[in-house]
């Protein structure tokens, strides 16, 4: 791979994808570390050479979409500064650096420890997809369970991982690979198709919102079921107690199957 050409290409897409001042301010990027707990935590790893913690393209777009849909309920956290989003790390065995993988794992762990009631959604773009893949598959089960959905744009490990994240539910992952994006075919060849994913951020946001909604509905149903079971159990205990008190043999009748 020609790293110089890749650098020029990524610089060009950065210049072609401006984010206005209001959007930059809305995006934040270090809100898990520095802010208060929110019902939803979005953790994102940017593409190579993108500045900031969320980057300047797909990361802020999804963050802002979540915040507009769930006003006041979302904390957005980018992976960095140990994840430097340098070009050379793409050529490493895991397609990113060990430091980046560990930092992402630490952020997921921090979200669960600091904010035990938060629901986590995540995403990555280009090298950032490798950061997500390599970190999530190594997490303990109790942390994975808190992650409700993951969106991956230009998945650099798509071929190696067969379009999913190892050791993680496939239905929680949405991969966006544009036609002609050779990065998704297991190469490090970057062409124009790799810079088209802003057009997928609206759909990706809806995917994450759907996973959050499904999780909330499941929790509500579980709570209702538990309440109903408790009520039924209490009623049965009350009935049993009433029957026992009216019998001269108390609970002895139960020893014979109610005969």
Swiss-Prot record:
For this protein, the record's Pfam families field holds: Cutinase
Query: What name appears for this protein in its UniProt entry?
Result: Probable cutinase 2
Would you tell me the Gene Ontology cellular component terms?
extracellular region
What is the catalytic activity of this protein?
cutin + H2O = cutin monomers
Question: What GO molecular-function term can you cite, just one?
Answer: cutinase activity
SUPFAM superfamilies under this entry?
alpha/beta-Hydrolases
Which EC number applies?
3.1.1.74
- Entry's InterPro entries? AB_hydrolase_fold, Cutinase/axe, CUTINASE_1, CUTINASE_2, Cutinase_monf
Q: Location of site Transition state stabilizer?
A: 48, 127
Q: Which residues form a coiled coil?
A: none
**GO BP term (any one):** carbohydrate catabolic process
Question: Which residues are responsible for catalysis?
Answer: 126 (nucleophile), 181, 194 (proton donor/acceptor)
Residues annotated as region Disordered? 215-259
Q: What class of enzyme is it?
A: hydrolase
Q: What is its main location?
A: secreted
Which residues are connected by disulfide bridges in this protein?
37-115, 63-76, 177-184
- Keywords of the record: Disulfide bond, Hydrolase, Secreted, Serine esterase, Signal
Q: Which family does it belong to?
A: Belongs to the cutinase family.
The keyword Ribosomal protein appears for this protein? no
Which purpose does this protein serve, as stated in its record?
Catalyzes the hydrolysis of complex carboxylic polyesters found in the cell wall of plants. Degrades cutin, a macromolecule that forms the structure of the plant cuticle.
Q: Which residues form the signal peptide?
A: 1-16
**Subcellular localization, per the record?**
Secreted
Give the matching PROSITE patterns: CUTINASE_1 (PS00155), CUTINASE_2 (PS00931)
């Amino acid at each position: 791979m020609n790293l110089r050409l890749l650098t020029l290409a990524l610089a060009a897409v950065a210049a072609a994808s401006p984010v206005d001042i209001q959007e930059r301010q809305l995006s934040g990027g270090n809100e898990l570390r520095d802010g208060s707990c929110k019902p939803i935590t979005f953790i994102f790893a940017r593409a190579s050479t993108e500045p900031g913690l969320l980057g300047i393209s797909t990361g802020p777009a999804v963050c802002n979409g979540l915040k507009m849909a769930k006003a006041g309920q979302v904390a957005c956290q980018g992976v960095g500064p140990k994840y430097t989003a340098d070009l050379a790390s793409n050529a490493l065995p895991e397609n990113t650096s060990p430091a980046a993988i560990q930092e992402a794992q630490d952020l997921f762990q921090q979200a669960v420890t600091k904010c035990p009631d938060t629901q986590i959604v995540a995403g990555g773009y280009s090298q950032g997809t490798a950061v997500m893949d390599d970190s999530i598959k190594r997490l303990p089960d109790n942390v994975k369970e808190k992650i409700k959905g993951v969106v991956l744009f230009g998945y650099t490990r798509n071929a190696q991982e067969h379009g999913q994240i190892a050791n993680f539910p496939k239905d929680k992952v949405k991969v966006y690979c544009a036609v002609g994006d050779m990065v998704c075919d297991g190469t490090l060849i970057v062409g124009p198709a790799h810079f088209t994913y802003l057009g997928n951020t609206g759909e990706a946001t809806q995917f994450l919102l759907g996973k959050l909604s499904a999780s909330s509905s499941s929790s509500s149903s579980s709570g209702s079921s538990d309440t109903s079971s408790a009520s039924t159990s209490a009623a049965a205990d009350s009935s049993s107690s009433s029957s026992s008190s009216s019998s001269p043999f108390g609970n002895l009748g139960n020893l014979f199957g109610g005969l």
